[in-house]
């Protein structure tokens, strides 16, 4: 969602798309994550704070696992309908970071069954909302330096 730390995959790729930079992906892009829209995550936290039991743990997740290559291709597809690119932006596979986790996934059944919380925003909706937010708030990403957004790339 909006204002995620700029070095993370989605804001980094959006920044690069807007600036016609190549899209660097670690390894073969197979590292997968469970994606959840920020508003859904905040609503889950509120549910835990107001309805959860003290001392209990509640994993917050969407059950939507996608790898980095799938997420990047999704952003490229969205960009084709939203902005005019100055040149063809390419996906560029770079050396993976040492110790880079291959998969993050949660079992969020407990929060769903005990607190009746479910994400409202599917991945496709959330990624479009995020792209649109960055497109409408260009001053935000322009205030970030390129160094802040791509500082870890290539430092395997």
Model-derived regions: residue spans:
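Flexible, glycine-rich beta-alpha linker
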Residues: 1-8, 31-32
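C-terminal substrate-binding subdomain of Rossmann-fold SDR/epimerase-dehydratase oxidoreductases
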Residues: 11-156
């Amino acid at each position: 969602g909006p204002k995620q730390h700029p070095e993370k995959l989605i804001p980094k790729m959006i920044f690069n798309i807007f600036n016609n930079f190549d899209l660097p992906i670690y390894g073969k892009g197979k590292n997968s994550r469970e994606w959840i829209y920020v508003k859904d995550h905040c609503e889950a936290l509120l549910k835990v704070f107001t309805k959860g039991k003290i001392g209990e743990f509640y994993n917050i997740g969407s059950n939507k696992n996608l790898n980095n290559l799938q997420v990047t291709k999704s952003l490229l597809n969205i960009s084709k309908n939203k902005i005019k690119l100055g040149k063809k932006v390419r996906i560029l596979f770079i050396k993976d970071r040492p110790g880079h986790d291959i998969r993050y996934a949660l079992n969020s059944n407990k929060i769903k069954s005990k607190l009746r919380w479910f994400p409202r925003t599917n991945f496709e909706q959330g990624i479009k909302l995020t792209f649109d937010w960055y497109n409408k708030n260009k001053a935000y990403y322009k205030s970030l330096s390129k160094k802040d957004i791509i500082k870890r790339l290539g430092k395997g």
